[in-house]
Amino acid sequence: MKKNMSRRHFLKMGGLALAAMSVRPSLSFAAFRESETKFVSLRPSIDKRRFVSRAVEVIIKEVKPKIKDEKLRWMFENCFPNTLDTTVRYKMKNDRPDTFIITGDIDAMWLRDSSAQVWPYLPLMKDDRDLQFLIAGLINRQTECILIDPYANAFNDGPLGSYWETDHTQHMVKELHERKWEIDSLCYPIRLAYQYWTLTK
């Protein structure tokens, strides 16, 4: 079905482009295609977003008018808040913030990736206490994960197991998603915790 839709769309666009070129030969297919593109927001509706940061929304409103290129402006609006919109699970656990951030396409949290995903938001914590708690919650969760296994790189949101659990490695417990340690699996959480401390002390 998808192939037919794409073929139909291609034939329609090709036919229209040829017709336009016969009227104005200088009009290229690329220019015709570009004029048809509409850069609309692809963000989830507000009620479907996993976390909403006032500071992030303010930055989007401030920065968008300064980006002249329409496509880059659209990419910024959709990409900058994407971690908060789609990948965050935030709650209070034993009176402390707890944040689990999936990598996006896999329902597991990588120590390195989750650190990098929130890094652009660190300077905004001073203007948004909820955002600060969310990042503190990630540091709490990463610490908990490292204490489960300092040689693992990716973790589940609880003892769920994974398709890697039959790997012939020691300590492949249900909380682990992968046990493929690299030095940045520890460096990124340390870097995040240090930067958080620097900005909030």
Stretches found by the model and what they are:
Residues 54-91, 141, 145:
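Amphipathic alpha-helical dimerization/protein-protein interaction segment
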Residues 34-44, 97-112, 194-197:
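Basic/polar, acidic-poor N-terminal "presequence/leader" segments
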Residues 2, 40-47, 51, 63-71, ...:
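A short N-terminal beta->alpha junction/helix N-cap motif
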Residues 107-201:
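Aromatic-rich carbohydrate-recognition surfaces in CAZymes
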